[in-house]
């Protein structure tokens, strides 16, 4: 629903802010991953969204966001924006016009839980369902200009461990002018206290 809303409403130059708590934080991170992988088609082409989701779910290395195949896909699917400088350079080298860079202005999330609805105490069911949803790209992308993740330090339930970002140091080093734009901090309290 969030992706379709953006397709229908986004105009180049708009700022995009994405927020979520718990499983909603996982969904917010997945939405940003989908945007990074596919871009956004024109309003009149919202019917193309299933193509993007199918590619996003694929484990084929050719569908990774930075691959040349993905650049080709976005050229046809999302011609009015690029999702990275690498893609802009690729379009220029191929003789195509270079549209504006699509970015996420801010991603704010609280206590991301990666389990998509099946608690761990239903172990076999959780493994089947959660594995089938394992395509989600929840790593932080440099297309996000600033991001914060508040994580509860006192949560003791083993069924929903937090899903942490592992690449913040790298992103902060690559973007020193942004002054620690990417942060993941622990806060006192359990899951409901930090997010509620």
Give residue ranges: language-model regions.
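Alpha-helical segment proximal to the catalytic Tyr-Lys
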Residues: 1-196
């Amino acid at each position: 629903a969030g992706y379709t809303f953006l397709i229908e409403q986004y105009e180049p130059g708009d700022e995009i802010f994405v927020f979520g708590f718990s499983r909603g934080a996982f969904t917010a991170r997945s939405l940003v991953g989908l945007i990074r992988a596919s871009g956004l088609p024109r309003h009149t082409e919202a019917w193309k969204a299933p193509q993007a989701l199918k590619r996003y779910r694929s484990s084929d290395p050719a569908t990774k966001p930075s691959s040349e195949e993905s650049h080709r896909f976005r050229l046809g699917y999302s011609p009015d924006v690029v999702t990275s400088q690498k893609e802009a350079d690729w379009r220029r080298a191929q003789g195509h016009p270079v549209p504006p860079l699509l970015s996420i202005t801010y991603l704010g999330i609280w206590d991301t839980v990666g389990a998509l609805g099946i608690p761990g105490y239903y172990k076999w069911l959780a493994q089947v369902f959660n594995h089938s949803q394992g395509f989600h790209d929840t790593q932080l992308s440099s297309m996000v200009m600033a991001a914060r993740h508040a994580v509860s330090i006192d949560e003791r339930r083993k069924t929903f461990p937090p899903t942490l970002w592992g690449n913040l140091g790298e992103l902060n080093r690559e973007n020193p002018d942004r002054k620690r734009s990417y942060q993941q901090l622990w806060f006192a309290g359990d899951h409901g206290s930090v997010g509620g």
